[in-house]
C-alpha cells in the first residue's frame, strides 16, 4: 500500500524533542514535546516558550501540564500557539491545607506536547 512508499519517521529523541511523521499527500505531521518556561503563578503575566523546531505551516495545538508532583502546590495553566515556533502560557498554583485551597505566588514550570504540520 501507500504507507510502504512513505519516507521513514525522523526527529530527535530527548527531554525536548520532536518527530516528523510522513503522511499521504506529501505532508508531515509533527509532534513536539519538552519543558516550557517557568511562569510566576498569580502574577497575571503571559509567558512565551519556544518549541524545539518551528512548524513549517500550521501550529495546531499545544497542551501543558505541571511537571512536579512532589511540589507543595499544584500548577494549572493554559496555553495557546503564538507563532510557528512559540506558544504562550499563563498559570495559577494552588496548595491545600485541610479543606481550604490557597492560591500561591510561586514559580510553575510545565511540560508540553505540541502538534502541527
Q: For the regions a protein language model found, what residue spans apply to each?
A:
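GGW-centered surface loops in extracellular recognition modules
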Residues: 16-35
Amino acid at each position: 500500500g501507500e504507507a510502504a512508499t512513505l519516507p521513514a519517521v525522523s526527529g530527535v529523541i530527548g527531554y525536548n524533542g520532536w518527530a516528523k511523521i510522513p503522511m499521504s499527500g506529501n505532508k508531515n505531521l509533527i509532534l513536539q514535546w519538552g519543558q516550557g518556561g517557568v511562569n510566576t503563578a498569580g502574577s497575571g503575566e503571559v509567558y512565551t516558550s519556544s518549541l524545539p523546531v518551528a512548524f513549517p505551516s500550521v501550529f495546531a495545538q499545544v497542551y501543558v501540564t505541571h511537571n512536579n508532583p512532589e511540589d507543595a502546590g499544584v500548577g494549572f495553566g493554559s496555553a495557546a500557539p503564538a507563532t510557528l515556533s512559540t506558544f504562550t502560557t499563563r498559570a495559577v498554583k494552588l496548595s491545600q491545607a485541610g479543606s481550604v485551597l490557597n492560591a500561591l505566588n510561586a514559580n510553575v514550570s510545565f511540560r508540553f506536547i505540541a502538534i502541527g504540520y
